[in-house]
Amino acid sequence: MWATCCNWFCLDGQPEEVPPPQGARMQAYSNPGYSSFPSPTGLEPSCKSCGAHFANTARKQTCLDCKKNFCMTCSSQVGNGPRLCLLCQRFRATAFQREELMKMKVKDLRDYLSLHDISTEMCREKEELVLLVLGQQPVISQEDRTRASTLSPDFPEQQAFLTQPHSSMVPPTSPNLPSSSAQATSVPPAQVQENQQANGHVSQDQEEPVYLESVARVPAEDETQSIDSEDSFVPGRRASLSDLTDLEDIEGLTVRQLKEILARNFVNYKGCCEKWELMERVTRLYKDQKGLQHLVSGAEDQNGGAVPSGLEENLCKICMDSPIDCVLLECGHMVTCTKCGKRMNECPICRQYVIRAVHVFRS
């Protein structure tokens, strides 16, 4: 280890060999990803909808549309058509029309796209989901369209399922009316008149469908009328100040009707926690409205129908009939009544955009 050529102690140039420790042995290279445990077996096939495992391959059915596996309960076959899952059947029943797809739930749209492996992560609107469905719609033959529209009566369960999204749009027929009367209501008036002329007389059974058809059209015509023109309380419409004939009528109003009257006349009811507080504001509004109307009508009677120039300044500059009782914001001009103020998009004086119209009470 030490050089003996001179009296100097010099290190030898060869490194000292360190004997391997006992118990250590050379280990061959091994793959770190290798595991001595047996590889896991493949997942058992299960239904995509309910998650039930298939006991045998006979219960496994493949949807022709989304190509996913379903059980016998979650898939069906309408007539001689292809076997589809229940969700794909609902979409095929719409014939992939935009109007029908917009009526479906967002969850159903997302589930359908998920079955077709289409990501909906960036979709924020329902219309975007409908566009994705329309972009990947399968090819539907004319036979499938007719089968979806007119189903075979031999499959009532499938017919009830496919027509379920549209059941809310069909008005229920009265059980007292016979089936012939229900069919006669769809007959056009021109055809009814031709049948009357051909038969020479009209029976009572033939007159009833025409009468029912005319009565059914009355609510649609009434809905188009203005709310302000109605003078009596009608269920399903908002209450109005013109419905009140006396102060005693205010006591019979509900809390919702009181709030509707205040909201229609631009009176703020925030902070009112009790019903009597709402009644107090409606009473004040009613008295103020009646007082202004009596003031204008009394001045017209004294002057023979003409409004004096002093009171003309207090009349609405739009209708020239009701007194000025609201202020337009943000400009602050008082030139209209409440009825005309809520229809103003811009101030008639300064042409500034109207953000809000607020009812004011005169002292």
Swiss-Prot record:
* Induction cue: Down-regulated upon DNA damage.
Gene Ontology terms for molecular function? p53 binding; protease binding; protein kinase binding; ubiquitin protein ligase activity; ubiquitin protein ligase binding; zinc ion binding
Q: What is this entry's stated membrane topology?
A: Peripheral membrane protein
Q: Domain (SAP): give its ranges.
A: 101-120, 250-264
Q: Region Disordered: list its residue ranges.
A: 165-209
Zn finger regions (RING-type) covering which residues? 316-351
Q: What is its main location?
A: cytoplasm
Q: Which CDD domains does the record cross-reference, listed alphabetically?
A: FYVE_CARP2 (cd15770), RING-HC_CARP2 (cd16707)
Coiled coil stretches, renumbered: none
Which InterPro entries does the UniProt record give?
CARP1_2_FYVE (IPR049320), CARP2_FYVE (IPR049322), RING-FYVE_E3_ubiquitin-ligase (IPR051728), RNF34L-like_HeH (IPR055111), SAP_dom_sf (IPR036361), Znf_FYVE_PHD (IPR011011), Znf_RING (IPR001841), Znf_RING/FYVE/PHD (IPR013083)
Regarding how it is modified after translation, the entry says: Autoubiquitinated.
Q: Could you name the Gene Ontology cellular component terms for this entry?
A: cytoplasm; cytosol; endosome membrane; membrane; nucleoplasm; plasma membrane; recycling endosome membrane
So what does this thing catalyse?
A: S-ubiquitinyl-[E2 ubiquitin-conjugating enzyme]-L-cysteine + [acceptor protein]-L-lysine = [E2 ubiquitin-conjugating enzyme]-L-cysteine + N(6)-ubiquitinyl-[acceptor protein]-L-lysine
Q: List zinc finger spans: FYVE-type.
A: 41-96
Subcellular location(s): the record lists:
Cytoplasm, Cytosol; Cell membrane; Recycling endosome membrane
Query: Where is the PTM Phosphoserine found along the chain?
Result: S226, S229, S232, S240
What does the record give as its pathway? Protein modification; protein ubiquitination
Q: What class of enzyme is it?
A: transferase
On tissue specificity, the annotation reads:
Ubiquitous. Detected in spleen, thymus, prostate, testis, ovary, small intestine, colon and peripheral blood leukocytes.
EC numbers on record: 2.3.2.27
Keywords (alphabetical) are: Apoptosis, Cell membrane, Cytoplasm, Endosome, Lipoprotein, Membrane, Metal-binding, Palmitate, Phosphoprotein, Repeat, Transferase, Ubl conjugation, Ubl conjugation pathway, Zinc, Zinc-finger
Complex formation: Interacts with CASP8 and CASP10. Interacts with RIPK1 (via protein kinase domain); involved in RIPK1 ubiquitination. Interacts with PRR5L. Interacts (via RING-type zinc finger) with p53/TP53; involved in p53/TP53 ubiquitination. Interacts (via RING-type zinc finger) with MDM2; the interaction stabilizes MDM2.
Q: What does this protein do?
A: E3 ubiquitin-protein ligase that regulates several biological processes through the ubiquitin-mediated proteasomal degradation of various target proteins. Mediates 'Lys-48'-linked polyubiquitination of PRR5L and its subsequent proteasomal degradation thereby indirectly regulating cell migration through the mTORC2 complex. Ubiquitinates the caspases CASP8 and CASP10, promoting their proteasomal degradation, to negatively regulate cell death downstream of death domain receptors in the extrinsic pathway of apoptosis.
| Domain notes from UniProt | The RING-type zinc finger is required for the ubiquitination of target proteins. The FYVE-type zinc finger domain is required for localization to the recycling endosome membranes and the function in endocytic recycling.
Q: What is the protein name given in its UniProt record?
A: E3 ubiquitin-protein ligase rififylin
Species of origin reads Homo sapiens
